[in-house]
């Protein structure tokens, strides 16, 4: 996370994880395009199909929409990723779980300022304070980021604040308090057509300047995690949270082209941990209840050249999502070599929307499902195991996915909403191997196959508005491989490779009709078409030299990705690419100060490539270009009191 990295986007650590694609749009107004095994690739913003958790507090709300802008990498200690069948027990997320943990304070007290500058006017600075005294462990971090942006009309300013306090209350009780906040203001460069990309990859897309497309976000959330031991074999954990998020977004359209969204979200996850012996066999059990709710007040206005104007077509909706889930998971060890795991989760999610003006309400819909997983693990030897797992998943639409009808996105007129979208259901099988080879190498290999019915796919995207529909059958299958090696001469090597075949498995028809019945567009999405927004291959490789006695470190990074489709028809795509990065770090100790400097050059060979796409963009503005050769340099210092 911290070794010569920008510590700017969660894509930095995630690119080292096989199965995860975190495509950087170079657009802070739209977030990263994150997918896990192809799930989440259809998200128009934020993280969809992936559960986000930060210090035990969910970053994913009741309807399954996740936000990542509040993740503070400057104070993150680790980022854990769970993929496949085990992730279904986390609820409304079929693809995986991203769990971020902040650093813990070290004994005494430490103050650590940091500063970095880079290409395209990038400037980041902040201060981190941590320590531990009298059974109180604390971390406080405040950071600011500015960038002029790689593309025209893409500058951004972001401030992150993160607080973590852990109180040790006696021998059996601990209380962790979490609070974080993000303030973001970003211009939106939109996507480019193929012709625009060829002409000027750094230009803003059509409509960005005339509508002054942009986004501002203010989010604050807090929570606590109470851990209470109830004896030698039992532990109770309760984690309530509460937060609010205010978003104002100017889209590249006139009518309803300004969205003012206020969201309140809250909930609690409580679970019981139990260890026992069953017939002389070790047994672990976790059972819990997870309840969440988010309430949105959504206003829209007309975007007149970047100014918000009231109009008769303005929307005024009160929207709500709530879920109440029960889950249980057990692990039995019949022998030292065998581990058996099973779990089930009952989910109940309701989405509703009421109009506060003369426009019609969108109605309500309740989704219910029981999902589960089974896994068998066999230890060939102490540090090597093979496993097979099965899991079923459940993925409801978000409030954002039901707000627009396809005909409204394409033609305007009356918006009837899209409350009738079904939940996607997934059956997934995985086999794999995990091995630590001697003391110098580690290798993980996994093969997976996931069948989805009623997959939620993008019907159309235009002017910042996106409409969705169900695809009858899709499939995602692939290979994931990761390895790490300690080599002679103080060298270390690592690799993460993904091969993904994500395709439609049953032909379906998309029909989009305007308010005038004579204007209808109908087309076929054929079986065998690729699911857009996700590459068919991905590779991250690194060779690092580190000299322990003087703190010097040099590394070469290689990144490559296969092509990705930009629309369901597979009539547009972005070519694959390969780039190389270099980084260097130096560390010193001067008096009570620990100092480190770093510098990195990304895309050393100055390759031109597309970093991300806007799936099914109605005006063919699919492409979001990535930077050419660029640099970043910074310094960190820490003083212990």
Explain the meaning of each model-derived region.
Residues 272-274, 335-340, 348, 442-451, ...:
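Gram-negative outer-membrane beta-barrel transporters
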Residues 168, 180, 328, 388, ...:
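Conserved C-terminal beta-signal and adjacent last beta-strands/turns
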Residues 185-198, 293-306, 348-355, 364, ...:
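Surface-exposed extracellular loop regions of Gram-negative outer-membrane beta-barrel proteins
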Residues 110, 117-146, 151-189, 214-231, ...:
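Transmembrane beta-barrel wall of Gram-negative outer-membrane proteins
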Residues 10-13, 41, 49-50, 57-83:
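Short acidic/polar hinge/loop motifs at secondary-structure boundaries
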Residues 172-182, 216-356, 379, 444-447, ...:
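Face-selective signature of the C-terminal outer-membrane beta-barrel domain
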């Amino acid at each position: 996370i911290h070794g010569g990295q920008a510590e700017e986007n969660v894509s930095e650590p995630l690119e080292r994880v096989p199965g995860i694609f975190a495509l950087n749009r170079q657009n802070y107004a739209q977030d990263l395009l994150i997918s896990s095994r192809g799930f989440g690739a259809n998200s128009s913003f934020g993280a969809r199909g992936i559960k986000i958790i930060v210090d035990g507090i969910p970053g994913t709300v009741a309807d399954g929409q996740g936000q990542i802008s509040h993740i503070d990498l400057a104070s993150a200690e680790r980022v854990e990723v769970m993929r496949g069948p085990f992730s279904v027990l986390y609820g409304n997320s079929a693809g995986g779980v991203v769990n971020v943990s902040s650093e813990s304070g070290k004994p005494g007290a430490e103050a650590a300022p940091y500063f970095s500058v880079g290409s395209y006017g990038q400037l980041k600075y902040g201060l981190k304070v941590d320590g531990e005294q009298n059974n109180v462990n604390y971390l406080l971090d405040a950071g600011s980021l500015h960038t002029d942006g790689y593309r025209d009309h893409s500058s951004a300013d972001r401030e992150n604040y993160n607080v973590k306090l852990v109180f040790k209350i006696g021998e059996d009780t601990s209380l962790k308090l979490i609070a974080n906040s993000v303030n973001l203001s970003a211009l939106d460069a939109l996507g480019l057509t193929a012709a625009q990309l060829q002409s000027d990859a750094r230009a803003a897309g059509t409509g960005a300047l005339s509508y002054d497309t942009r986004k501002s976000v203010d989010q604050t959330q807090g929570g606590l995690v109470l851990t209470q031991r109830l004896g030698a074999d039992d532990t109770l954990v309760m984690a309530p949270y509460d937060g609010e998020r205010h978003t104002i977004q100017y889209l590249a359209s006139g009518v309803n082209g300004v969205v003012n969204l206020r969201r309140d979200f809250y909930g609690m996850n409580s679970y019981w941990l139990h260890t026992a012996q069953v017939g002389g066999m070790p047994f672990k059990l976790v059972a819990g209840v997870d309840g969440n709710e988010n309430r949105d007040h959504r206003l829209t206005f007309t975007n007149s050249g970047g100014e918000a104007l009231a109009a008769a077509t303005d929307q005024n909706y009160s929207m709500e999502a709530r879920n109440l889930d029960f889950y249980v998971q057990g692990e039995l060890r019949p022998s030292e070599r065998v581990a058996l795991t099973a779990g089930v989760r009952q989910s109940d999610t309701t989405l509703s929307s009421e109009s506060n003006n003369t426009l019609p309400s969108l109605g309500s819909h309740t989704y219910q499902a029981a999902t589960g997983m089974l896994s068998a693990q066999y230890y060939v030897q102490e540090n090597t195991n093979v496993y097979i797992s099965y899991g079923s998943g459940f993925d409801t639409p978000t409030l954002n996915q039901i707000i627009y009808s396809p005909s409204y996105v394409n033609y305007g007129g009356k918006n009837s909403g899209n409350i009738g979208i079904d939940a996607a259901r997934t059956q997934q099988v995985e086999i794999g191997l995990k091995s630590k080879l001697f003391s110098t190498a580690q290798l993980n290999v996994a093969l997976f196959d996931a069948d989805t019915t009623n997959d939620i796919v993008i019907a159309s995207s235009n002017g910042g508005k996106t409409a969705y529909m169900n695809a009858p059958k899709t499939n995602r299958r692939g290979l994931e491989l990761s390895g790490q090696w300690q080599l002679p001469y103080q060298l270390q090597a690592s690799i993460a490779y993904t091969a993904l075949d994500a395709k439609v498995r049953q032909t379906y028809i998309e029909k989009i009709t305007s308010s005038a019945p004579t204007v209808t567009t109908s087309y076929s999405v054929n079986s065998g078409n690729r699911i857009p927004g996700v590459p068919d291959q991905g590779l991250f490789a690194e060779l690092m030299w580190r000299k322990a006695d003087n703190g010097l470190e040099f590394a070469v990074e290689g990144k490559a990705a296969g092509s990705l489709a930009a629309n369901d028809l597979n009539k547009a795509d972005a070519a694959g690419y390969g780039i190389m990065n270099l980084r260097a770090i130096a560390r010193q100790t001067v008096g009570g100060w620990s100092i480190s400097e770093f510098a990195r050059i990304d895309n050393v060979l100055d390759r031109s490539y597309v970093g991300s796409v806007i799936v099914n963009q109605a005006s063919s503005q699919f492409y979001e270009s990535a930077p050419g050769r660029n640099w970043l340099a910074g310094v960190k210092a820490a003083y212990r009191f």
